[in-house]
Amino acid sequence: MDLGIAGKRAVVCASSKGLGLGCAEALAAAGVHLVMNARGAEALDASAEAIRAAYGVEVTTVAADVTTQTGQAALIEAAGEADILVNNAGGPPPGMWTDWDREDFMAALDANMLTPIALIKALVPGMMERKWGRVVNITSQSVKAPIAVLGLSNAARTGLTGYVAGTSRQVAGSGVTMNNLLPGIHATDRANALDGGVVKAQGITLDEARARRAATIPAGRYGTREEFGAACAFLCSQHAGFIVGQNILLDGGATLATI
């Protein structure tokens, strides 16, 4: 399927690896020029060069922490007249409710709520003026069904979801769509970290931890960055103009919900 977005310009946050990289690769395959961001320059530059070689698109890199004002300013400057924004950030660490204080919550809110909102406020007005734009926020399946040990993530990502629910309806009339992708377990560093915690807590091997988690997923496996990226690219396409303010689960059926 031709997604109809060749020549567009996309900002993809946290895109040196994992789900962000999957989104960047899928957009590049559709002919979209990229502004890629991550904190570490080495991995970011390597991923960007691989995408340039594979797809022949323009790729600008911004190695910066976008939870800071300096990092946000650098990314916004590089974005130019961006048509697409993919918000993404690593989740806060797991723990128990007794572990977290105000500083922990503020760090989670900065990364998983306030930074995406800042980038939306900076880039969406230009999209509205040009009468076309796409915003995809990568959140979590915990928005639909909270995960007890991920209380910081539950809170911050649900806050972003509430913001998007209202804002998406305000900008849709200008040709800008805004939606959220809610990943379940995918084969990423984040999954490795969570599985590693199970290994330590239960005294089992990593393979056993992964097998047990996969058994809780009706699809019987972890998701891949490639299939996640394909879903993101479709939401950014010309074909997705009537999808507004939605929370789309990509979890292999793991979340038990009717709606």
Task: Locate the predicted segments by residue.
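Substrate-binding pocket helix/loop in short-chain dehydrogenase/reductase
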Residues: 96-109, 135, 213-214
